[in-house]
């Protein structure tokens, strides 16, 4: 049996542009893709912190160091320039792989520059923001 597990995320990125008339996808700075272990063409879930919208699409590599997070195509109806988003990937793993897996969590600033790397999906970096109630720190599976 395979399990679908959280693989990586780019946390609280700022959308730099939204282009309704592009074919589709999300353009992401290659530095961010590398930091999060996300490949161009990989499926991602996008959660819009600003308005609560959720969608799935695939990544396109953006210029390295540009900070680009560009929403392309019909998703631009849901996610807009300057919205705060979380890009999430999942992977299918065996039970043994899941037990050994350490996800990649990439925290970015408002300019989409990496400010912290980690592997705890519940750990925030916003001052005063606590872990979710009852969230364990790296529990054994």
From Swiss-Prot:
Q: Where is the active site?
A: 25 (schiff-base intermediate with substrate), 58 (proton donor)
Looking at the UniProt record for this protein, which Gene Ontology cellular component terms does it annotate, in alphabetical order? Answer: cytosol
Q: How is it modified after translation?
A: Is synthesized initially as an inactive proenzyme, which is activated by self-cleavage at a specific serine bond to produce a beta-subunit with a hydroxyl group at its C-terminus and an alpha-subunit with a pyruvoyl group at its N-terminus.
EC number of this enzyme: 4.1.1.11
| Binding-site list for substrate | 57, 73-75
Localization of this protein: Cytoplasm
Q: How is the cofactor bound?
A: Binds 1 pyruvoyl group covalently per subunit.
Q: Which UniProt keywords apply?
A: Autocatalytic cleavage, Cytoplasm, Decarboxylase, Lyase, Pantothenate biosynthesis, Plasmid, Pyruvate, Schiff base, Zymogen
Obligatory cofactor(s): pyruvate
Catalytic activity entry? L-aspartate + H(+) = beta-alanine + CO2
Gene Ontology biological process terms in this record? alanine biosynthetic process; pantothenate biosynthetic process
Its chief place of residence is cytoplasm
Q: In which pathway does it act?
A: Cofactor biosynthesis; (R)-pantothenate biosynthesis; beta-alanine from L-aspartate: step 1/1
What Pfam families does this protein map onto? Answer: Asp_decarbox
Q: Which SUPFAM superfamilies match?
A: ADC-like
Q: Does the keyword Phosphoprotein apply?
A: no
Looking up Gene3D superfamilies in the UniProt record yields: 2.40.40.20
Residues bearing Pyruvic acid (Ser) are 25
Give one GO term, molecular function aspect: aspartate 1-decarboxylase activity
Name the protein family.
Belongs to the PanD family.
Assembly, in brief, is: Heterooctamer of four alpha and four beta subunits.
Role: Catalyzes the pyruvoyl-dependent decarboxylation of aspartate to produce beta-alanine.
Official protein name in the record: Aspartate 1-decarboxylase 1
Organism (species) = Paenarthrobacter aurescens (strain TC1)
Q: Which gene encodes it?
A: panD1
């Amino acid at each position: 049996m395979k399990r679908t597990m959280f693989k990586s995320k780019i946390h609280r990125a700022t959308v730099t542009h939204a282009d309704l008339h592009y074919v589709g996808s999300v353009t992401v700075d290659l530095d961010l893709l590398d930091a999060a272990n996300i490949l161009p063409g990989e499926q991602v879930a996008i959660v819009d912190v600003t308005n609560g919208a959720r969608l799935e699409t695939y990544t396109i590599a953006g210029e390295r160091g540009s900070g680009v997070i560009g929403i392309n195509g019909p998703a631009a109806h849901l996610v807009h320039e300057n919205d705060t988003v979380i890009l999430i990937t999942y992977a299918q793993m065996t039970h043994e792989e899941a037990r050994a897996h350490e996800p990649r969590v990439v925290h970015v600033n408002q300019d989409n520059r990496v400010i912290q790397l980690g592997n705890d999906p519940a750990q925030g970096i916003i001052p005063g923001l606590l872990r979710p109630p009852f969230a364990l720190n790296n529990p054994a599976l």
